[in-house]
């Protein structure tokens, strides 16, 4: 059967990558405000304070804070049914420890949600998308402290209660499974171990990281329970960065490597959030890595009861794994792996694999039997603004066409229960991995360079009209 008639077509962004206004409306600094600009080859720097000579792109980003009415009008012109966005925690609780929320922060999002409603667009709200209040990073080393669970629950309860009737869909933590990687220390968990500066090569303490991830999983379950209590109409989902892998060869040892890699990155957090308990393989992983988690009986009961209502995911690429140390490697700037000889790569070295999306959706469906929504998918590429204001991006249209076609096959031929699709970076924004504006994903071009200079004027790319037609025909015309 085709996509359901109320399928949620739209786009996605994150507050720290699009909003700007980092010191306006009572907002406090977040962890993202201390990330410098980088490039494909130069890692971003994590600084304890503002340092001369460095650019901090998330502070201005795409200036959605001052352009939201225009931006939402453009989404409406494309026919968006949904807009997946995040609320900046430090705009609601500037340090994370206030007992009362910042009224100006709540008002800003009230205005955004009212504008979305005026254009018939459903908000899908991520409560935490790599933007922990900086104060909590400095005082508690982020999620390493159990104290942060209660602070996050207060924030989540405030948001869900205040926006009752305006927001029906929430995601707890963006790409929570990035906490299974050393890369996730700062970005996902707010951990800044001593000596950490290079964003891509952080000082790692696996014990601290997995304890912090446990605290985050408990907070996610607390949020689900609070959401159901405060707003019975609300649906609370998880958000997993799906990074499928294939065994490079039919060597049984490659198959075992594939199995272990897949479940530890893709399933470890999802099993807890969807099934309510740690999976059987977690204990052996902890023992092999000298991890001794503090898990209380109350934690176990919270996890058991606080399972999510739906499964959301990001999907960009796949990799291969092998036990062969001499295998050629993919050149991805964020997560690498063995090079797949059957796949092409993006300008940033990410291996493009539409069929992998179909495979992934089927794996999720068969494992969890929950409604699924894709909340991130897209192609980061360099775009050229022509003298006449046009931007020709056939490469983006091609990428999205192929992924939507694979998504359709998963629904129509395989029976996957998919209820929405929001492309990543529908409006150009700051790249999380590199801090660049040059790595553009949007249907809407923002006139801003990597140093934050430009008019911030918005221009429609060729893909703008193409996606409008896709939505208008409910995915029939690609």
Question: What residue ranges belong to the model's regions?
Answer:
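Active-site region of glycoside hydrolase catalytic domains
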Residues: 1-46, 51-52, 76, 95-97, ...
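Active-site mouth loops of central-metabolism enzymes
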Residues: 53-66, 144-146
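Short, flexible active-site loop motifs that bind/organize anionic cofactors or intermediates
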Residues: 58, 65, 96-99, 347
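Catalytic domains of carbohydrate-active enzymes, especially glycoside hydrolases
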Residues: 63, 67-88, 305-310
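Glycine-rich, proline-tolerant flexible connector loops at the mouths of alpha/beta enzymes
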Residues: 87-101
